[in-house]
Regions:
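Acidic (Asp/Glu)-rich catalytic clusters
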Residues: 92-101, 119-130, 163-174
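Catalytic domains of carbohydrate-active enzymes, especially glycoside hydrolases
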Residues: 61-81
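Glycine-rich, proline-tolerant flexible connector loops at the mouths of alpha/beta enzymes
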Residues: 74-100, 104, 108-111, 136-146, ...
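Hydrophobic or amphipathic alpha-helical targeting/insertion segments
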Residues: 114-140, 152-153
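N-terminal small/glycine-rich loop or linker at the start of catalytic domains
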Residues: 29-55, 133-147, 172-180
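Active-site-adjacent beta->alpha loops and helix N-cap segments on the catalytic face
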Residues: 27, 34, 58, 82-95, ...
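Helix-rich catalytic cores of soluble enzyme domains
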Residues: 140-188
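N-terminal amphipathic alpha-helix/helix-capping segment at the start of soluble metabolic enzymes
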Residues: 2-47
Length: 188
């Protein structure tokens, strides 16, 4: 797979000085120094199941999207399309109307459940580049009470969902897909 590189941002990263390194001679990674700005990513447009009492409608999301682009963000999480029709419609709008600049990568969030993953791939179809951000609950309480699974069972949910994502890449051949995974944990 060919994963897209992020276009450098015009954000004023020169204003921030580098950290003072801590020397740990028994390790190699702490001695590495960042010489380039990290990827800047916005998650301001995701309402999904974390929506406020009054979630953003499409015109508000579009105004915010345009502002984030103008500010120089190159990765923008534009929604949780399988969690809300508003988010799905917004993602489709910015794709169908060609509102995503060539150097901006959209990101969408999805839970590790087959119908939600499939709906998410429907949402990003036709975009030039997209990041599918997959997550599943790994906390002790949901693992036991909601799923009735042990750690291996929860791990299988994640790996099966990741495999499904890989399989669905072929359904969006015009889109360069990247992946992100997050374990969701509230109670340990």
């Amino acid at each position: 797979m060919n994963f897209p590189e992020q276009t450098p941002s015009k954000m004023p990263v020169h204003r921030y000085s580098s950290f003072i390194p801590v020397e740990l001679t028994d390790r190699t990674w702490p001695d590495k120094k960042m010489t380039a700005a990290p990827k800047w990513s916005s998650v301001d447009l995701r309402d999904g199941n974390q929506a406020l009492i009054d979630p953003m409608d499409t015109p508000r999301k579009l105004a915010m999207f345009k502002l984030l682009v103008a500010m120089g963000y190159k990765e923008i999480e534009v929604g949780f399309p399988s969690a809300s029709q508003t988010d799905f419609d917004f993602v489709r709008k910015i794709i169908d109307e060609g509102l995503i600049p060539d150097d901006v990568i959209i990101q969408v969030l999805t839970q590790a459940r087959e119908p939600l993953i499939r709906r998410t791939f429907e949402a990003v179809k036709g975009s030039k580049q997209a990041i599918i951000h997959l997550y599943n609950s790994t906390s002790t309480l949901p693992r036991r009470v909601v799923f009735g699974l042990d750690k291996e069972g929860i791990k299988k949910i994640a790996t099966d969902a990741a495999q499904l994502c890989l399989d669905l890449v072929s359904t969006v051949p015009e889109t360069k897909i990247s992946f992100e995974y997050s374990p969701e944990s509230y109670t340990g």
